[in-house]
Amino acid sequence: MNKQPEDWLDDVPENIDEEDDEIIWVSKSEIKRDAEALKDLGVELVELGKNALERIPLDEDLRAAIDLAQKIKKEGRRRQLQLIGKMLRARDVEPIQTALDKLKNRHNQQVSLFHKLEALRDRLVEEGDDAIPPILALYPEADRQQLRSLVRNAQKEKAANKPPKAYRQIFQYLRDLAETAE
């Protein structure tokens, strides 16, 4: 057997613990997971529409690759998505991820606002004039007379089993009020 000379200990640096702290070992599996996450981010970007894609900070090469991937079908699309993932690995994806999260959050906020407005509309139709003051407190620019007439029409339509035209008009009016309040 080959024995190492006793002086091999002299080659070991004294601050070995400090060097270990500086070296960050990343497993191959973690690298693959990160690459897959970036590829999934690329898929999300490709599935976005043109208007949403314009709001995301992308350089020209990446934008061109995404535009091309949106046009390609089948196997070529898979390869293009892999290329987009590779391009994302070479870039700082934090601003892209932040912009994408804002787009998703905006959609969720809009859905919750619509649910809130639907509940207000249902309350207006059920309670009638008694439900108008809280809405006026919430939206001071609301027209009390218009709200009352829409509510009366919706109640008449409901009693006569007619299509809910005024019901939809109440929702549109509340949505317009919410948009102007923002």
From Swiss-Prot:
InterPro entries: DarP, DarP_sf. The keyword Translocase does not apply. Gene3D superfamilies: PSPTO4464-like domains (1.10.60.30). SUPFAM superfamilies: PSPTO4464-like. It is found in: Cytoplasm. GO terms for cellular component: cytosol. Keywords: Cytoplasm, Ribosome biogenesis, RNA-binding, rRNA-binding. Its main location: cytoplasm. One of its GO terms (biological process) is assembly of large subunit precursor of preribosome. GO terms for molecular function: ribosome binding; rRNA binding. NCBIfam families: PRK05255.1-1 (NF003593). Belongs to the DarP family. HAMAP family: DarP. Member of a network of 50S ribosomal subunit biogenesis factors which assembles along the 30S-50S interface, preventing incorrect 23S rRNA structures from forming. Promotes peptidyl transferase center (PTC) maturation. This is Dual-action ribosomal maturation protein DarP. It comes from Serratia proteamaculans (strain 568). The lineage of its organism: Bacteria, Pseudomonadati, Pseudomonadota, Gammaproteobacteria, Enterobacterales.
